[in-house]
Structures are given as structure tokens and as C-alpha cells.
């Protein structure tokens, strides 16, 4: 029906109602129509799906993956997913810590503790923290896996954000606009929520973006010097039935995410020991955890790794001391 015809029809009907009924009845009829209209509008608004909270999404992820966590190929409750799309590489690691949610929150909500975590990575030569008005900065000093003085490293500045902290949910993000070697939009995220048995379900994700030029360089690297460096995702089987693992940027980001996951676990495992003993214990613990996955994570002999980290830790403490004294 044409719109003009609709309006004329409505006018005729209203006039008909008005003529046949008293004004009071007409007003009742009018109020009825308004009420129905409001009910429909409210119903339509409520039918629009609200954005899901991070806590709900993480809890749903836990329930959907309970069986996978119990039968994980890692040999412990740990699963990994990754993707590579356009200029972005992303990985998610999910696992279970045998520690209470409150103990996880108390450790990770302190920005300085993240330097103890990330500096376990072989490529992180030092990490410092600094508080600014309304912001925390974590500076990663990135270099080769062997020992390097700090002046030979690349600095990447991360912003620490405690996005959400509730009684039953924690969400922390470390973000850097510019990364090493032309990468950008680096985001490390940590989520946690309590589950049964006094344990904590955790999520560690990492992502970054790169450029076309960097993609070409990466392909050359992984086809030559980086040949044989693989991640954890199985893409098929070889002629004798052995698994073929993902390589390239996805393989690299999977390795790094698992290293950071085990770094968090190592720090958590040693909180019960005196502060002065923790550094040497957590470097040894981290090495032992990662050495279970030699194909993906082996880089250095344990003796060399511990020696390099001991030197790097001294450099880190000296640098952090100068920042605390206002010299940096």
C-alpha cells in the first residue's frame, strides 16, 4: 500500500472510532496503541545482542576446551592456537596453574614483576619499569640469544595496562606501537579466572603486525638461517608418519608465546622462596620447563643460558637502579 494511502486509511479509522465512542474510550484506545508501540520498541532494543564481557568469553573457552586440556600433546594442561592473516600474526595459549586466583593476581598486577617474567626469554637482555602520571612503561632490551651489553640491544617500550580486575577475573595488556625490525602494534595479553580445586585458568596471547618488506625478509630468513625452526601446530605428516610442524612467522610467535607462558609459571612456582634466591632458581626452572620441547624451544646449553642470564640480570639491576635514582 502506498504511504499516502496508509495515512488516509489511519485517519479514516481514527475518525470512525472517535464518532462511535466517547472521548474517554478513544483515549483508552490511544493509550493502548502507545503502550503496544513502546513494548515493541523495548523488545527490539533488548533483542540486540550486547557485547560479551572478557570474563564470559574466557569462561566459555575453558568449558569448551576442558577435554583438550586433559589430553594435550604438551603433556600438561596447555593448548595453543594461532593464525596469520594479512599483515597480522596472532597466537593464544591457554593453560591451568595449580595456584589460587588471588596469588596469580597479586603477582601479575605489579608492573615490576613483569620484568622478572619477560627477562627469562633468551632474546630479552634486560627489562626496566618506570611509573609516569597515569601510565607504566616497561622497556624491553632485545638482542641475540648470546650475551650482549645493553648498548648493543634494541629498545621496545611497552605500556602496561590493568584493563580489568575483579573478584573473579583479571585482564592485563602490554602494548607497544613500534617493535623491532619494522614490526608494529605488539600486544601481549594475560587473562585469568578461578576454576575448581583452587586452580586458575589462564590465557596468554601475543600479536603483532609487519610490513610487506619485512614479510619478504622473513621468508628469506626462514628459508635459510631459520630453516628448521618450528612451532607447535601440526600441519600434516611426513612420509614416515612423523608430524610436520608450522614454521615461518606463526612458528616463531608460537615459540615466543610458550616461552612467556612458562616464564609466568616459573615465577609463580618460586614465590614461596626468599626473594634473594629466586633469580637463580627461576632461570633454572624456566630452562627445565622449556627443554621438554627441545625441537621447538632449544637454543642454548643450560650452562651458557644461566651464565648469560646472570650477567644480564646484573646489567638490569644497575639500569633499574639508575632509573629509580632519577638518572634515566
Q: Where do the PLM segments sit?
A:
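A short, structured loop/turn motif at beta-sheet edges
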Residues: 98-101, 131-134, 160-169, 191-201, ...
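N-terminal secretory signal peptides that target proteins for export/translocation
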Residues: 1-26
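Terminal, regulation- and interaction-focused segments at domain boundaries
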Residues: 80-107, 128, 245-252
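Terminal "cap-and-tail" regions of soluble proteins that handle hydrophobic small molecules
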Residues: 46-73, 79-84, 177-179, 189-328
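Bacterial N-terminal signal peptides
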Residues: 30-41
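Ser/Thr-rich, low-complexity intrinsically disordered terminal regions
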Residues: 59-65, 109-146, 164, 169-172, ...
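Glycine-rich portal/gate segments that line the openings of hydrophobic small-molecule binding cavities
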Residues: 123-187, 209, 290, 297-328
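Sec-exported extracytoplasmic/periplasmic mature domains
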Residues: 106-116, 265, 269, 273
Amino acid at each position: 500500500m502506498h504511504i499516502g494511502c496508509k495515512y488516509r486509511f489511519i485517519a479514516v479509522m481514527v475518525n470512525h472510532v472517535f464518532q462511535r465512542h466517547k472521548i474517554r474510550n478513544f483515549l483508552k484506545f490511544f493509550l493502548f496503541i502507545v503502550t503496544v508501540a513502546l513494548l515493541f520498541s523495548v523488545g527490539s532494543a533488548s533483542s540486540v545482542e550486547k557485547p560479551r564481557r572478557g570474563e564470559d568469553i574466557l569462561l566459555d573457552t575453558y568449558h569448551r576446551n576442558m577435554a583438550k586440556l586433559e589430553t594435550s600433546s604438551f603433556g600438561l594442561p596447555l593448548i595453543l592456537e594461532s593464525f596469520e592473516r594479512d599483515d597480522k600474526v596472532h597466537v593464544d595459549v591457554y593453560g591451568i596453574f595449580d595456584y589460587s586466583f588471588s596469588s596469580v593476581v597479586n603477582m601479575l598486577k605489579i608492573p615490576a614483576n613483569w620484568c622478572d617474567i619477560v627477562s627469562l626469554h633468551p632474546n630479552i637482555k634486560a627489562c626496566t619499569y618506570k611509573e609516569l602520571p597515569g601510565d607504566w612503561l616497561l622497556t624491553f632490551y632485545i638482542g641475540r640469544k648470546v650475551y650482549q651489553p645493553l648498548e648493543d640491544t634494541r629498545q621496545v617500550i611497552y605500556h602496561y595496562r590493568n584493563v580489568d580486575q575483579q573478584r573473579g577475573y583479571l585482564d592485563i595488556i602490554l602494548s607497544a606501537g613500534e617493535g623491532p625490525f619494522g614490526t608494529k602494534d605488539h600486544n601481549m595479553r594475560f587473562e585469568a579466572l578461578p576454576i575448581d580445586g583452587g586452580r586458575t585458568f589462564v590465557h596468554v596471547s601475543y600479536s603483532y603486525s609487519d610490513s610487506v618488506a619485512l614479510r619478504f625478509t622473513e621468508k628469506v630468513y626462514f628459508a635459510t638461517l631459520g630453516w628448521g625452526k618450528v612451532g607447535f601446530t601440526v600441519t600434516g605428516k611426513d612420509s614416515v608418519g612423523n608430524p610436520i610442524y608450522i614454521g615461518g612467522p606463526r612458528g616463531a610467535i608460537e615459540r615466543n608465546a610458550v616461552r612467556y607462558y612458562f616464564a609466568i609459571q616459573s615465577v609463580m612456582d618460586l614465590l614461596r622462596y626468599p626473594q634473594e634466591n629466586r633469580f637463580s632458581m627461576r632461570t633454572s626452572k624456566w630452562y627445565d620447563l622449556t627443554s621438554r620441547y627441545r625441537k621447538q624451544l632449544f637454543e642454548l646449553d643450560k650452562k651458557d643460558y644461566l651464565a648469560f642470564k646472570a650477567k644480564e640480570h646484573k646489567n638490569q639491576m644497575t639500569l633499574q637502579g639508575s632509573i629509580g635514582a632519577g638518572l634515566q
